[in-house]
Amino acid sequence: ILISNNNTISTMESCTGGGVSNAITNIEGSSSIFKFGAVTYSNEYKIKMGVNSDIIDEYSVYSMETANEMSKKISDFTISDYGIGITGKINRIDNNNLFGEDNRVFISIYDRNMNKFYNSEVITTDGSRSYNKDIIINNVIEMLLGILK
């Protein structure tokens, strides 16, 4: 759908580790629509990519506010029609970021042309990290398809 609409997309992923970028680039012809994928696993690199540190400090890195910052900043950085931001905790305690609920992931898709955020939360299971990443990635792709239709 992105290809036929001549839209572009970029991602800033944390807990999915580039899985959404991988899913998009598995589609033949995706080079015409996929501009950039960043895996910003640490706060430092989220901030270097433009995420406002005050947002992280006020709401935590594991928040919809941070996911929104990620999706908008990656769209702005790459001048993409859509930006995807994903942050959250999967099956673990993060000693560097003590706030936020375990097994809760925040997904934001920013539509640059409409200046609009589409948001979703996924509650993961106690299954493996790989299994939970697949659930999140599938949710993002389904969400994106719903926006584009």
Regions found by a protein language model. Give the residues of each.
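Short alpha-helical segments enriched in small residues
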Residues: 1-149
